[in-house]
Regions:
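A short helix-loop-beta-strand connector motif used in the catalytic cores of GNAT acetyltransferases and
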Residues: 46-58, 79
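Conserved beta-strand in the GNAT
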Residues: 58, 64-72, 79-84
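Conserved acetyl-CoA-binding loop-helix of GNAT-fold acetyltransferases
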Residues: 85, 91-104, 127, 131
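Hydrophobic adenine-recognition pocket in adenosine-nucleotide-binding enzymes
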Residues: 9, 83-85, 118
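Conserved GNAT-fold acetyl-CoA-binding loop/helix
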Residues: 18-47
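A short beta-loop-alpha structural element at the N-terminal edge
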Residues: 5-19
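Active-site acidic-Proline motif in GNAT/NAT acetyltransferases
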Residues: 73, 86-92, 120-121
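C-terminal "cap" of GNAT-fold acetyltransferases
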Residues: 48, 112-163
């Protein structure tokens, strides 16, 4: 996979990020209600506005954006959101590359906790997160997130913990 790389995203990547999120979540659309699906597949204008909230990364293969992830700082720690890999690029190590970049950045912030939310039916995503040191924290209720139950996961990072 020597032709795959990860870099910090720029506002010019907003349309590609929106496209990747739509591609990745459309294949599991039936698990979301309309409001939740709109939240996980924001339009490029929403993506552009998020650049003030924290860093975003894109993964590329041969110059084409195939994955994305972003990070915001919250009272509870660093919140990982919008992790997605195009269905055509899954199982190629793109998720690992994105997590590596995110973890490297996280260590530099001095904050130690990264947390995320995923859905129970996304067993592949959960397995990838667990492989990279994330652990289940709690189940979330449908009342907490747009009518869709999920689960919270976390990882503690520091110079000695980065994989």
């Amino acid at each position: 996979m020597s032709n795959a790389s990860v870099r910090l995203a720029t506002p010019e990547d907003a349309a590609d990020i929106s496209r990747i999120l739509l591609e990745a979540f459309t294949v599991i659309r039936e698990h979301y209600n309309a409001e939740a699906f709109a939240v996980v597949t924001p339009k490029s204008e929403i993506i552009e506005s998020r650049f003030t909230e924290g860093p975003m990364w894109v993964a590329e293969i041969d110059g084409r954006v195939v994955g994305t992830v972003s990070l915001t700082t919250e009272p509870e720690g660093l919140y990982m959101r919008s992790m997605a890999v195009s269905p055509t690029a899954q199982k190629l190590g793109i998720g690992r590359l994105l997590l590596d970049a995110l973890h490297e950045h996280a260590v530099g912030t001095g904050l130690t906790r990264i947390f995320l939310y995923t859905l129970p039916f996304q067993s592949g995503a959960r397995a990838m997160y667990e492989k990279h040191g994330y652990r289940w924290v709690r189940d979330t209720t449908a009342d907490e997130w747009y009518g869709v139950p999920g689960l919270e996961m976390e990882k503690f990072v520091g110079k000695e913990n980065v994989a």
